[in-house]
Amino acid sequence: MATREWFVMNAQQTKLALESPPLFAVKKDDDKDHTCDTGEEPYALVGSPVFNPLEDYKREVVSIIDEYFSSGDVEVAASDLMDLGLSEYHPYFVKRLVSMAMDRGNKEKEKASVLLSRLYALVVSPDQIRVGFIRLLESVGDLALDIPDAVNVLALFIARAIVDEILPPVFLARAKKTLPHSSQGFQVILVSENSYLSAPHHAELVETKWGGSTHITVEETKRKISEFLNEYVENGDTREACRCIRELGVSFFHHEIVKSGLVLVMESRTSEPLILKLLKEATEEGLISSSQMAKGFSRVADSLDDLSLDIPSAKTLFESIVPKAIIGGWLDEDSFKERSDQNGGSENLRRFKKDAETIIQEYFLSDDIPELIRSLEDLGLPEYNPVFLKKLITLAMDRKNKEKEMASVFLASLHMEMFSTEDFINGFIMLLESAEDTALDILAASDELALFLARAVIDDVLAPLNLEEISNSLPPKSTGSETIRSARSLISARHAGERLLRSWGGGTGWAVEDAKDKIWKLLEEYEVGGVISEACRCIRDLGMPFFNHEVVKKALVMAMEKKNDRMLNLLQECFAEGIITTNQMTKGFGRVKDSLDDLSLDIPNAEEKFNSYVAHAEENGWLHRDFGCSTDS
């Protein structure tokens, strides 16, 4: 067989051999008189239970996987695996998870793939994922004895891992070189390569092969809630209704049961006693938490205006139910009031949310940042800036990559122009606190939010330390905390800056140096007599608005070197057309300021020229007036 050095962690095997304790313990027999030579052995070998970390790990892992297949709770599975410690054995976990899923239904296969993607880099390292799959390839012959289609199923798991980007595509080529051509493992690679990864639209086909998402859809959940509530109103069986709530298995969505129940009461007054009884019992049994109850009531409060169109007495009925719930002890008054305030309890906030949504939708159509900033300023409610940020990102997450990129670009434009760092922090906290709810409508919400957070750090909208501040505001094992960890992982990855700038197609795929070279060339062409409108078009065509600070920096340096202030005319036109924002201007001027010592070696009057450019920029509104003060200091 060909060498397996790439696959087998020899150091790990050696460590296992060294750390494995003896099978027997040596016990000294102190009861014997050793002054006499009796010819008896003074020591006896006795059987002793011995701690074997790998065996214990294997047992625990099977339990974790079984529980995960039953509950589908990724967070619990990840937490349990981390609590085990013994991370050096995680390749075994990968092998065991996949092999157990291979012998089960499509639901478990999908769950296994989802879990691997969520654990990737955070709990299980990329190398451990790779080694786990190699061990599967090496043992597929044994698996085929119990699972007739093992070759095909494992091929699909590998294809899915490549589509999910937890295995690199080069994995296939490397595996081919190390596996015997006659082995079933080699056949797995061929099937994965030829049957799954070479087909048109293969990513979509592979992702949906086992039925796609393991999560019940929002529409289906709402339908089931409506069905069992209607049945309950007909038969009055509270115990059966509680059983239905349990079987739904969506504790984070119980507020929808509360909301649907209250709406049902408004539509049919005769159902009120039964619905209130059910909500009371569900609370007392711990089925519906106090926070979910408060959330359900606040959702109804938020939609009273719409409900009143079909049910004129909706507001009156709701106001009569709230005191009953509070007096009955199953609605916490403080939680309800607090949540109502957060979710738009005031008329001003409701109106702001509606107006914000309108101007964001217009921005997605026009891509006009200056107009959006003017519209936001016209609203005149800076205290709701975090709410605007939450609305912007939530709407973008439910759209295509183009809108996601536009949202990130706009956040960078808002930075230092309108929004404070505190606004950004509070906005992201609001997003992360509601991540579970958002995930019901946008299944990849957690991953998308992690990208938005990481991108905000790369764009200097947030500092890396701000992630710690945001994390401290969230429950330790919440979805929001997991999203923060994912964002940190994205930021720490190799070439993170370039990859994140192109995560939604924002960049053109060039290297940064290539982009800088193109900027320098277009400025040179303009400097020797180019047309200003053509130069502006070229800057637009770069398609990197978040990198326009480099245009500012190079234009200022060229103006100093060539002793030609014509560059200032170009910057003025770019600013007037909204191509370069105040934020990008500030960043560009700041970069030049930071490099003045080096520039002065070649341009003796660099500082004098720079100060005159700052004065010109402040006079024309490119920079805030306090920029010059910071320069003087």
Swiss-Prot record:
Residues in MI domain copies: 56-177, 220-341, 351-472, 514-633
Induction remarks: Induced by dark and starvation but repressed by glucose feeding subsequent to starvation in a TOR-dependent manner.
Main subcellular location: nucleus
Keyword Cytoplasm part of the UniProt annotation: yes
Gene ablation phenotype (knockout): Increased susceptibility to dark and starvation, and to treatment with the TOR inhibitor. Decreased translation activity associated with altered ribosome patterns, especially in the dark and starvation conditions, in which mRNAs distribution is altered and rRNA abnormally degraded. Slightly early flowering time under long-day conditions.
Entry's Gene Ontology cellular component terms: cytosol; nucleus
Cellular location(s): Nucleus; Cytoplasm, Cytosol
A GO molecular-function annotation: ribosome binding
Residue interval(s) of motif Nuclear localization signal 2: 389-396
Keyword presence, Cell membrane: no
Motif (Nuclear localization signal 1): 94-101
Tissues of expression: Mostly expressed, at low levels, in rosette leaves and flower buds, and, to a lower extent, in roots, stems, cauline leaves and flowers.
Gene3D superfamilies per UniProt: 1.25.40.180
InterPro entries: ARM-type_fold (IPR016024), Initiation_fac_eIF4g_MI (IPR003891), PDCD4 (IPR039778)
Domain of life: Eukaryota
Gene Ontology BP annotations: negative regulation of DNA-templated transcription; regulation of translation; response to absence of light; response to carbon starvation
Task performed by this protein: Involved in target of rapamycin (TOR)-regulated translation control, especially under energy-deficient conditions.
Quaternary structure, from the entry: Binds to EIF4A1. The association with ribosomes is modulated by cellular energy status and TOR activity.
Family of this protein: Belongs to the PDCD4 family.
Protein name: MA3 DOMAIN-CONTAINING TRANSLATION REGULATORY FACTOR 4
Protein's organism: Arabidopsis thaliana (Mouse-ear cress)
